[in-house]
Amino acid sequence: MVSKRVESLLNQLRTQGIVDERVLEAIALVPREKFVDEAFEHKAWENTALPIGQGQTISQPYMVARMTELLTLTPESRVLEIGTGSGYQTAILAHLVHHVCSVERIKSLQWQARRRLKQLDLHNVSTRHGDGWQGWQARAPFDAIIVTAAPPEIPTALLAQLDDDGVLVLPVGEEHQFLKRIRRRGNEFIIDTVEAVRFVPLVKGELA
């Protein structure tokens, strides 16, 4: 039995076009309040992005659901997340697939996310402190790659780490950003523009 706050959010997401019941179930199962600072706990189930420190944010639940839905995951999907952040998106993915790989450039965020995931008994996640622009070559190829910060252009390393028929979902742009869904067909990449978005930038090279 879900609470009224959770049910209200799920209804909002359905109204906004989220139809994948597995994604909605994962949203309901992951306690978002565990991924935000105490000062923002009362807003945890609102459909809004919230700050998590280090100039980063926990994405709006709609955007988490939308991007996850666009990945068209199966339990067997090999998934790479770029930008672990709070670990919230990671937790959603961990409820949907057997294993998740996640890269975070800010060490303190990586450790906090690992602690939260462990507290929730989500042990099917591998995290790495590294440059998201480079992906995770040692674990490639991936069926699905999701990027939770916006590069000015699509990182070529991520395209290279997509398996055939794999999907990359990411925001792209600087001042004006658009959510893109890219599917690999052999050596070709089919790019669809989904909607206008606003994300923090995907910082290149610089680890913190």
From Swiss-Prot:
EC number in record: 2.1.1.77
Record keywords, A-Z: Cytoplasm, Methyltransferase, S-adenosyl-L-methionine, Transferase
Catalytic activity annotation: [protein]-L-isoaspartate + S-adenosyl-L-methionine = [protein]-L-isoaspartate alpha-methyl ester + S-adenosyl-L-homocysteine
A GO molecular function held by the record: protein-L-isoaspartate (D-aspartate) O-methyltransferase activity
Gene3D superfamilies (alphabetical): Vaccinia Virus protein VP39
Coiled coil residues, start to end: none
Broad EC category: transferase
Pfam families for the chain: PCMT (PF01135)
GO cellular component terms, A-Z: cytoplasm
Record bears the keyword Transferase: yes
Protein origin, superkingdom: Bacteria
Entry's family note: Belongs to the methyltransferase superfamily. L-isoaspartyl/D-aspartyl protein methyltransferase family.
Protein name: Protein-L-isoaspartate O-methyltransferase
